[in-house]
Regions:
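Short acidic/glycine-enriched loop/turn segments that link adjacent beta-strands
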Residues: 6, 96, 166, 198-202
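Short beta-strands and strand-loop turn motifs
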Residues: 22-28, 54-58, 163-165
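Short beta-strand-to-loop capping motifs
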Residues: 104, 172-175, 208-210
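Active-site pre-lysine segment of PLP-dependent enzymes
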Residues: 7-19, 31-54, 58-91
Length: 226
């Protein structure tokens, strides 16, 4: 990641060699929640040698509020070296069913076919129903946006640094990430130690929940620093 917690596409490009076959870009990024601008991604894809496929994971795209953000689905269905993946596990609320889909040209999909597994009939019916419930998607998106703003306000009041996010989670700089994680757990608040898991020093990753959950988290975080 760059100093702004975005994918360092230049650094990724420098690591590509004759043995490279697959490059994955998660956009929005996990764990930072930041997004790579569409123009930068298009340039990155165009720079790839023919033997490299770029997989763009758009699992969190439905949480993005940035007006300039645009998914890469249209690029994937027109270029043989791009595959876009999306999921029903996030904003659609179906994480246990493990159902998602990919966008690519037919030849690329054929090459990846052997690595796929078929979802159950229950998962298919649930995903179909989820696609028909756009009210849920809109409500969840709005709740997440309001939750972000609330957390930004409270974290600013506490004097804590954080990464502005376009997803349903965010990174917060807390100093002793392991210590704060343990103190929060004692209050039944469970966050991810981003320092230990993703090597993002001194940060925790917290999911953005309902207003009540966010308030509970802020109260616990204040207590952890007391």
């Amino acid at each position: 990641l760059t100093s702004e917690f975005r994918h360092d596409l230049d650094a990724m490009q420098r690591e590509i060699n004759d043995r490279t076959r697959l490059v994955v870009v998660t956009n929005p990024n996990n764990p930072s929640g930041t997004v790579v601008p569409r123009a930068d991604l298009e340039q990155f894809v165009a720079s790839m040698p023919d033997h490299v496929t770029v997989v763009v994971d758009e699992a969190y795209m439905d949480y993005v509020k940035e007006p300039a953000y645009k998914g890469m689905g249209d690029v994937a269905v027109s270029r043989p070296n791009v595959l876009v993946t999306r999921t029903f596990s996030k904003i659609y609320g179906l994480p246990g069913l493990r159902v998602g889909y990919a966008l690519a040209v037919p030849e690329t999909l054929k090459n990846f076919w052997m690595y796929t597994s078929f979802p159950s009939s229950i998962a298919i019916h649930a995903a179909t129903a989820a696609l028909e419930d756009m009210d849920h998607v809109a409500a969840t998106r709005q709740m997440t946006w309001e939750g972000r703003d609330y957390l930004y306000y409270e974290l600013n009041a506490m004097g804590l640094s954080y990464v502005r996010t376009e997803s349903n989670f965010m990174l917060i700089e807390v100093g002793d990430a392991e210590g704060i994680t343990r103190k929060l757990a004692r209050q039944n608040v469970y966050v991810r130690n981003a320092d230990r898991i993703w090597k993002v020093g001194n940060h925790i990753r917290v999911s953005i929940g309902t207003r009540e959950e966010n308030q509970f988290f802020i109260t616990a975080l204040r207590q952890a620093f007391a």
